[in-house]
Amino acid sequence: MLMVISPAKSLDFTAPDQVLPLTTPELKPQIAELAKVTRKLTAADLRRLMHISEKLAALNHERFQHFDPQVEEGLQAVIAFNGDVYAGLNARELDRPALEWAQDHLRILSGLYGVLRPFDALQAYRLEMGARLKTKRGANLYDFWGETIAKTLNAAGKDHADPTLVNLASQEYFGAVDAKALKLPVVTCHFKEEKGNTLRVLGFFAKKARGRMARFAIDNRIDKAEGLKGFNLDGYEYRADLSTPADWVFARLQP
C-alpha cells in the first residue's frame, strides 16, 4: 500500500529533536528544469501566477534565486511542511522506525519536486500544482509533469504486497497523476461532516483528517488498504453505505 498526500503552503524549518536521514529527491532532472524557469520569474510574475501578496511574492522570488537542485541540503519534507494535513500527521512526534516505515509507504505530491519521500531534502519554495507556469513541455504544471509522477508512483508501489494507491491528496494535486499511465489500483478517501440530515466535506476538517489517516496507517503499520477501514480517530468511522470500491467515505458528527 502506498499513500499520497498534498504538500503545504506553509513551512517550518525548525530542526527536529532527533537525527534523521536526508535522502535525495528522485526527480532531479525535472526539478532542475523547473528551477531554471522559476529563477527567471520576477516577484510580480509570481504574484500573478499564484495570486499571492507582494510580501509572499518577494519571499518566494528570493527563495527561487537561491534554490539549487544540485545541493543536497534542506530539511526532511515530512518535517518541513506545516499545513493542516501535517497538523494531522504530526510527523515530528513520530520515532525513527515509524518514519522509516513511512519512507516506504508515503509520498508527497509537489508542483516543484513532483514526488517526495518523507526523508527527501526539501528547500524552501512555493509552487502550487495548479499554477499556470509555462514551460517547454506545455502551458501548466500538469503538462510539465505528464506521466512522470504516475510512473514514479508505479515504481514505488509495484513491489508492495498490496499495490493499492491510497489517495489522500487534494484534487489539485492528484490531478497531476496521469490516470492512463498509472498502473496501481486507486482508492480515494473522503472525509465528511454530518450536521442535521446533511453530509458535507469541510476543507479544514478534511485536510486534517487526511493527515490523521496517514498517521493511523503509520502508527499501526497498515500495509493493506483494507485495514484503513478501521480508521476511527477524531470520531470518524467508515461508512459502507456511502462508499464504493474506489471511493471510501468516512463520516462523523460535525464538531
From Swiss-Prot:
Coiled-coil region(s): none
Transmembrane annotation, as ranges: none
InterPro entries xrefs: YaaA (IPR005583)
Any one GO CC term of the record: cytosol
A single BP term in Gene Ontology: response to hydroperoxide
Annotated NCBIfam families: PRK02101.1-3
Family, as annotated: Belongs to the UPF0246 family.
Stated name of the protein: UPF0246 protein Caul_4480
Native source organism of the sequence: Caulobacter sp. (strain K31)
Species classification: Bacteria, Pseudomonadati, Pseudomonadota, Alphaproteobacteria, Caulobacterales
